[in-house]
């Protein structure tokens, strides 16, 4: 197992820091705080559509050549901006972004749950494979949506309106029910089924998870090493068929 140092640019909720100047400033701050000379991978966290993508890519190529990171990517960028960045880098013969990091999970988000974030649907996920760019799926387990018992955050009576509109849909509750059903078949948790669903996609994909202790980490590893979902089970979770049996 190799150690990968992945550092995103700092996120400030009170103002946007996506510009060539701020990117360099935050990169230097992060290197100093972590105590390393370079990062294996550096991601621009969030986006500001008002800043020309050309200026951002020029700066990232400059910093890459200077040796501050080996590769870079973007996090929660909408598809058109990622495509624009790749196209510009090809024209300029830059290395370009190697990674795009939207959220991608068994949950089908109707809307972006938080401002400035982006949730990938199956079409955008497939786009990564077609364009040879890795998909780093954050909240790959559905942000706790498949926990049993359900988390208070997903109580229809108490959840914030944006969560209700984005996550608490009839489709997602059916996906949750089916994940719990398959969990009994595979002798695991529904959260593991949700993670196995993401890992089973035929995509250049890495799943970002958030275990809070060693037991949860070991449980997540089980989804990677032991749970092999069949094509019928994957379609069942997508609600494309009525049974998971072939």
Per-segment meaning from a language model:
Residues 12-15, 29, 166-167, 190:
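N-proximal short alpha-helices
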Residues 47, 51-245:
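Beta/alpha (TIM)-barrel catalytic core signal, keyed to glycine-rich beta->alpha loops juxtaposed to Asp/Glu
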